[in-house]
Amino acid sequence: MSETILTAENLKFRYDSEQPGYALNGVSMQVRRGEFVAVLGANGCGKSTLAKHFNAILLPEEGNVYVEGMDTAEDDKLYDIRQTVGMVFQSPDNQIVATVVEEDVAFALENLGVPPEEMRRRVDDAMKMAGIYEFRERAPHNLSGGQKQRVAIAGVVAMRPDCLILDEATAMLDPRGREQVMQTIHHLNKDLGITVVSITHYMEEAAQADRVLVMSQGNVVMEGTPKEVFSQTEKVRSLRLDVPQAAELRDELVKAGIPMPEGIIDTGECAQALYELLK
């Protein structure tokens, strides 16, 4: 089994072939099996367009996209690709189709003709993994935004994908809802080994990833660990992005003459550094 699960090679795509500008302009990147990768970028940079290529919702105009070595342009690979890569979108209401939580989680499995006993097991497992088992008999419209998004995640997880693509899946949630969803995502990644690619504009979420890609004007312009990327605060800001609050605080303290170590990106590190200075 290949260590690389997702690959883009010189990927070019535009929504209107009669217009000169490309939404993706020569993207080359890889995602390794089991990684948690965050993809950042200002609005219109191409990050959601890239995400849709990994599930073959969109196909390259030029270049190639491979999912576990399968070319997304090959029609006979489409079923296997979508079994391998599941997607969760921004609005959970657009993905929920049933009137009872457990029926919604089972929806795709029913369409695939999965035997009832296996379906029951997979649905229960997925709801427990997503932390919504207690809501299984409730109507989705009575749940909070974060709970609905976890229902959508459970529906994808029940398909047993190797990779989960989150296309701004926390964008419409309040802070508590975002926290609930991210706890679920980290559990799926760290405990179950599911590869995660998260398209996000929340820097604190990206700071928890294994690796960060920053996109601008249809290409990847920065790549590295969260520390490597967010330590370059001026470059990140020049791309019309924020930095994690802890990194911003660290910069302000340095400007005020307080010696702070490089690479601080979370509040715990910042608090520890200040504690060491005050001892």
Task: List each model region and its residues.
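Conserved ABC ATPase signature
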Residues: A139-L143, Q147
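Helix-to-loop junction immediately C-terminal to a conserved catalytic motif
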Residues: N55
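The feature captures the beta-strand-to-loop junction immediately N-terminal to the Walker
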Residues: L40-A42
